[in-house]
Amino acid sequence: MLKIKLEKTTFENAKAECGLVFIVNKDFSHAWVKNKELLETFKYEGEGVFLDQENKILYVGVKEDDVHLLRESACLAVRTLKKLAFKSVKVGVYTCGAHSKDNALLENLKALFLGLKLGLYEYDTFKSNKKESVLKEAIVALELHKPCEKTCTNSLEKSAKEALKYAEIMTESLNIVRDLVNTPPMIGTPVYMAEVAQKVAKENHLEIHVHDEKFLEEKKMNAFLAVNKASLGVNPPRLIHLVYKPKKAKKKIALVGKGLTYDCGGLSLKPADYMVTMKADKGGGSAVIGLLNALAKLGVEAEVHGIIGATENMIGPAAYKPDDILISKEGKSIEVRNTDAEGRLVLADCLSYAQDLNPDVIVDFATLTGACVVGLGEFTSAIMGHNEELKNLFETSGLESGELLAKLPFNRHLKKLIESKIADVCNISSSRYGGAITAGLFLNEFIRDEFKDKWLHIDIAGPAYVEKEWDVNSFGASGAGVRACTAFVEELLKKA
């Protein structure tokens, strides 16, 4: 992992094998830009990367004066430096966007540091010829870019230390999620997921309760149990409950995650091509584990409960079937018409369990629907719920964190599509349209009236796992939901 070292020196005087200079909005007037004639000769116009071998400076373009593009460019920089086999790099302090805000410097330092640290991630556990990065150190010269001196009132050193702490915690938390989601299903079972949660709990002095199928039976969590029936005796289910309790808590927050460690679709079997990447169906539960790590280390003033429903959805003699009717923990009956709509069954019981804790806010995370990916693309998560203020807060704070989010509206016409003639609700819509929303409306059936305005549903099916590099994410798992929800909790507590 890349170590970031803060030094009270100028960029020119800092010692490293290579310098890193960002060209913001194609502006070459910065004092750190050397040998402009060379750049002109090679027609480098401030896009992509360019290595000045004579001065040992890597130039990286930042398309616009924007904090998110700075983060992405920092990530591109370390990936390039890794390929070039430099052992150390030095960089100065930049401010991109929002120059009128007092926290502009802090936010840009967070973006810079996070981009630098996330860029080197690669899931290579099973590669026999691992290529470990020789890039080990980034020196940050605490020299303030002159235009900032009039607009940023925060102390530079204080901001740098705060930003570095954030970047280190967020990188660790995201990598916990990435590693867990990327873990293949032969290893990443419900029991394994619980073991990862126990490690996080031990390191952060959290309470943890890991419940088996007997507990689920006692609590009448029959929808959850049904999904696991084909795996029971081989890979039994686990209800994982993590608890972070600070001395002073302004809010009680329940975070609920879908933890499908593998999903073949059950008897409503997926086509072979659609099964590939279904190890990532534990993205929501993994995000909750990462969030507990982040929120505990950041020391947020909220009591946070992380609830993960971990199970497989497989085929076998005991598998639950289309036409089954399940009685959920909430007491509502569910007509099963498609066993591949299983995540919502697990979440229904887990949300019921979460409501028993009487939280002030409930947020669930799930790789719930392919329809969400069709509607929003593979880089954007969906936000659903009843409370407009809460949805807006999650969207704005999440977007500021660097994640892409969009609100999807509930409506009475789509609600009719999950009605059942023989049970209280059907687990699948009667229409092929609006599938992301109808899945959210299904979950809504299990939210009690007193919690309707306290609940948000986040569908992370798109960005949780993408088979290519994008933004600050490597091939595979991204840790979707962690940055957004951390920012949401912090903003929520400011209003408490």
Curated annotation (Swiss-Prot):
Residues annotated as binding Mn(2+) 1: D263, D340, E342
Cofactor note: Binds 2 manganese ions per subunit.
Cofactor(s) needed by this chain: Mn(2+)
Keywords: Aminopeptidase, Cytoplasm, Hydrolase, Manganese, Metal-binding, Protease
Subcellular location: Cytoplasm
MF GO annotations: manganese ion binding; metalloaminopeptidase activity
GO cellular component, one term: cytoplasm
Record SUPFAM superfamilies: Macro domain-like, Zn-dependent exopeptidases
Annotated residues for binding of Mn(2+) 2: K258, D263, D281, E342
PROSITE patterns: CYTOSOL_AP
InterPro entries the UniProt entry points to: Leucine_aapep/pepB, Macro_dom-like, Peptidase_M17_C, Peptidase_M17_leu_NH2_pept, Peptidase_M17_N
Record-annotated disulphide pairs: none
EC number: 3.4.11.1, 3.4.11.10
Location of the active site: K270, R344
A biological-process GO annotation: proteolysis
Keyword Coiled coil: no
Catalytic activity entry: Release of an N-terminal amino acid, Xaa-|-Yaa-, in which Xaa is preferably Leu, but may be other amino acids including Pro although not Arg or Lys, and Yaa may be Pro. Amino acid amides and methyl esters are also readily hydrolyzed, but rates on arylamides are exceedingly low; Release of an N-terminal amino acid, preferentially leucine, but not glutamic or aspartic acids
Catalytic class of the enzyme: hydrolase
Keyword Transmembrane helix recorded: no
PANTHER family tied to this protein: CYTOSOL AMINOPEPTIDASE, LEUCINE AMINOPEPTIDASE-RELATED
The family this protein is said to belong to: Belongs to the peptidase M17 family.
Matches recorded under HAMAP family: Cytosol_peptidase_M17
Biological role: Presumably involved in the processing and regular turnover of intracellular proteins. Catalyzes the removal of unsubstituted N-terminal amino acids from various peptides.
Protein name: Probable cytosol aminopeptidase
Gene from which the chain derives: pepA
